[in-house]
């Protein structure tokens, strides 16, 4: 039994193809709608699975080709994040057999596939499959790493992407002097479609590592949003996914920043001395930005692709507090009022300061001087 799956996002097609092949189906995939139509004519599948929203042509155009041009009754299943009633109605009027809204589970896709075309003769009915979720959007996550050989929680990362499709992790090795690069390359093995290792031979600091990673991931056409996250997972991937959900469901937001604001039910821990210094630094930051940010320094942020160049196009002045520079660049480019509408600060459910963090208390004091650098540099930029 042959299945053709058409979706412009490769991160959606990869787990879908893998699951259907595991079930015993013969599967071909295509990211371009026009080429998908050509493949339909040559492959002659028993089932077509297609997304509606694609850049070249709509998935409904694929349906029209099958039903109106080829006059074929080939079963068609639509997988889409589009919930527009008129679009769904048009799909069924054209003759689609099933419609599933993303996010959805591969288990359900498999069950509906069997209902539409039956099970392959070679299908192992006793086999149990993991319940991977196909997301509506595709997200790139940049994770800067410097000497993380002992601390990197490799299993936490792999477990998450194995269960949640639509994520592409980009680990940036920032000139580590230990075996971090070897650890990252081992992590990547077998998951090359979901994990990238970007190697910087020389240590340039976290700011430059994140910047290089963000610009690299911005070139990936199938990603909707791109963010960054600390390697120690002081903010975990589940909390990061909440930030993604916020930016996905609010068109006005271009940046959603995690915030370590202590609140009821949240697991937020900091050393008391570190907390006092953080409060002092935050007061200075609010004055520089003219914005009431509670926490700019949390290492968990998600961005719309259309603000990546403004935020990361130029090298940062400072090594650690580049987050402040990002927000300052946004306010200078869009204006303060517009920037306030674009930026969202979202409290985290969990944030724990991990042992072995590279930032010492002495370093924290140095940050005050770097804030002075930022204020001076971007005041000059504003005058130009």
Please provide the spans of the model-predicted regions:
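Short hydrophobic/Thr-rich beta-strand motif most characteristic of the beta2 strand and flanking loop
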Residues: 24-31, 39
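Acidic catalytic/metal-coordinating carboxylates
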Residues: 32-35, 58-62
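Active-site beta3 strand of CheY-like receiver
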Residues: 43-49, 54
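Alpha4 helix (beta4-alpha4-beta5 surface) of REC/receiver domains from two-component response regulators
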Residues: 61, 83-98
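C-terminal output helix
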Residues: 86, 104-113
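A conserved acidic beta->alpha catalytic loop
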Residues: 173-182, 233
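Acceptor/aglycone-binding surface of glycosyltransferases and processive sugar-polymer synthases
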Residues: 198-216, 225, 237-316, 320, ...
């Amino acid at each position: 039994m042959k299945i053709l799956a058409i979706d412009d996002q490769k991160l959606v097609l990869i787990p879908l193809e893998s699951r259907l092949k595991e079930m015993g189906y013969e599967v071909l995939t295509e990211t371009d709608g026009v080429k998908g139509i050509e493949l339909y004519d040559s492959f002659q599948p028993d089932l077509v699975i297609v997304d509606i929203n694609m850049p070249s042509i709509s998935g409904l155009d694929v349906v029209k080709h099958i039903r109106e041009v080829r006059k074929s009754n080939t079963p068609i299943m639509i997988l889409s994040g589009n919930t527009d009633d008129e679009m769904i109605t048009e799909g069924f009027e054209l003759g689609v057999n099933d419609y599933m809204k993303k996010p959805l589970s591969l288990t359900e896709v498999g069950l509906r596939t069997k209902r539409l075309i039956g099970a392959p003769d070679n299908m192992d009915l006793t086999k149990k499959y993991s319940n991977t979720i196909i997301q509506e959007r595709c997200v790139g996550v940049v994770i800067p790493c410097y000497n993380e050989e002992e601390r990197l929680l490799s299993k936490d990362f792999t477990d998450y992407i194995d269960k949640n499709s639509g994520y592409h992790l980009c680990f940036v090795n920032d000139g580590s002097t230990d075996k971090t690069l070897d650890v990252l390359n081992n992590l990547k093995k077998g998951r090359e479609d979901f994990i990238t290792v970007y190697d910087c031979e020389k240590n340039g600091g976290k700011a430059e590592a994140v910047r290089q990673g963000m610009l690299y991931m911005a070139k990936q056409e199938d990603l909707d949003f791109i963010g960054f996250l600390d390697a120690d997972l002081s903010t975990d991937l589940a909390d990061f996914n909440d930030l993604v959900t916020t930016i996905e469901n609010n068109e006005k937001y271009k940046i959603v920043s995690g915030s370590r604001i202590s609140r009821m039910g949240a697991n937020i821990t900091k050393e008391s001395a570190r907390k006092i210094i953080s409060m002092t630094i935050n007061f200075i930051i609010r004055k520089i930005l003219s914005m009431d940010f509670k926490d700019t320094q949390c290492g968990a942020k998600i961005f719309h692709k259309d603000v990546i160049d403004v935020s990361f196009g130029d090298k940062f002045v400072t090594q650690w507090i580049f987050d402040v520079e990002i927000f300052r660049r946004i306010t200078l480019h869009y204006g303060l009022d517009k920037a306030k509408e674009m930026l969202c600060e979202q409290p985290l459910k969990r944030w724990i300061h991990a042992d072995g963090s590279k930032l010492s208390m002495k370093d924290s004091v140095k940050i005050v001087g770097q804030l002075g650098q930022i204020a001076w540099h971007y005041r000059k930029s504003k005058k130009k």
